Amino acid sequence: MSDTVVSLASSQAPDAVRQDIRHDWTLAEIQAIHDMPLLDLVHRAGTVHRAHNDPADIQRAALLSIKTGGCPEDCAYCPQSAHHKGANLPRERLMPVDAVLKEAAAAKANGAHRFCMGAAWRKPKDGPEFDAVLEMVRGVRGLGMEACVTLGMLTQSQAQRLAEAGLTSYNHNLDTGPEFYGDIISTRTYDDRLQTLEHVRQAGIGVCCGGIVGMGERVRDRAEMLLVLANHAPHPESVPINALVAVEGTPLEDRPPIDPLDLVRMCATARIVMPKARVRLSAGRKSLTREAQILCFLAGANSIFYGERLLTTANNEADADAELLRDIGVPVPEVTLAAAE
């Protein structure tokens, strides 16, 4: 590690920070930032965060699995993979449009700004199901919410049709760094993922792209993932930081939980190298204490998934999230999901 890099990372003046949107990071720089003393790292990330964002603006996003299970990919962390029979996840068809929009309306009433829809596909096929997804996107936008979908790999024409339907953002995570990637997934290449992100960007849709920590990767692998994201121009509009939820029946079922401070470091490093991105504290947040979550917010996280499930895994209860956000000074409407039904 370079002491010079650490010194520069911790001493740069706030005025310079405001101008410092970079796409030429090196792996050594990112790893040095990640490995700074924790208090210095959180302070540095908080300085960058406040230079570019309103610290009281924490976006709430709801996430719904609109088509569950039976995915042909072999992602080692995912219970929706058809390869992982031991996960015992029922395979379900695509939800009806009206049922999805009812969920979106309830999420909006409960304070969500963005509604995200996930389908367990390798790639969507043109036809009735893709047309239904387009209708869902139009419906969510009609409710006055941001709309995000994650459907797997896209063609350029599919990305363009989603853009025309009003899609705000497309989620397609890198999951990890390119060197470790092959240990987790064999059915889709890293370049496949990057190609879909390029299609999304060319269509004018916002990019939502992040990864997972706690799968057995090294700190270097985490830094490599952030390097790929930070050197894309422009930066992703949002960067989900997930902690592995080890699900029984998947190849990673026995992975131990990560140290919550690892999530703090990832949020802080992502904030420093991508100053204006939404850093989204995502899967695995349920295992964090209130204090650990607040530390992530201080380190630059400014978005959470709001609701009791994230696709197929448990999330914090909406009431608990509302109480937490109010306690740190974030306005949340006094409405519950039950009241919205």
Curated annotation (Swiss-Prot):
GO terms for biological process: biotin biosynthetic process. Keywords: 2Fe-2S, 4Fe-4S, Biotin biosynthesis, Iron, Iron-sulfur, Metal-binding, S-adenosyl-L-methionine, Transferase. Pathway: Cofactor biosynthesis; biotin biosynthesis; biotin from 7,8-diaminononanoate: step 2/2. It comes from the Bacteria. It is an enzyme of class 2 (transferase). GO terms for molecular function: 2 iron, 2 sulfur cluster binding; 4 iron, 4 sulfur cluster binding; biotin synthase activity; iron ion binding. PROSITE patterns: RADICAL_SAM. Its EC number is 2.8.1.6. [2Fe-2S] cluster binds at residues 116, 148, 208, 280. Coiled coil: none annotated. Residues 56-285 form the Radical SAM core domain. SMART domains: BATS (SM00876), Elp3 (SM00729). [4Fe-4S] cluster binds at residues 71, 75, 78. InterPro entries: Aldolase_TIM, BATS_dom, Biotin_synth/BioAB, Biotin_synthase, Elp3/MiaA/NifB-like_rSAM, rSAM. It catalyses: (4R,5S)-dethiobiotin + (sulfur carrier)-SH + 2 reduced [2Fe-2S]-[ferredoxin] + 2 S-adenosyl-L-methionine = (sulfur carrier)-H + biotin + 2 5'-deoxyadenosine + 2 L-methionine + 2 oxidized [2Fe-2S]-[ferredoxin]. Its cofactor is [4Fe-4S] cluster; [2Fe-2S] cluster. Gene3D superfamilies: Aldolase class I. Pfam families: BATS, Radical_SAM. Belongs to the radical SAM superfamily. Biotin synthase family. Homodimer. Catalyzes the conversion of dethiobiotin (DTB) to biotin by the insertion of a sulfur atom into dethiobiotin via a radical-based mechanism. This is Biotin synthase. The lineage of its organism: Bacteria, Pseudomonadati, Pseudomonadota, Alphaproteobacteria, Hyphomicrobiales. The gene is bioB.
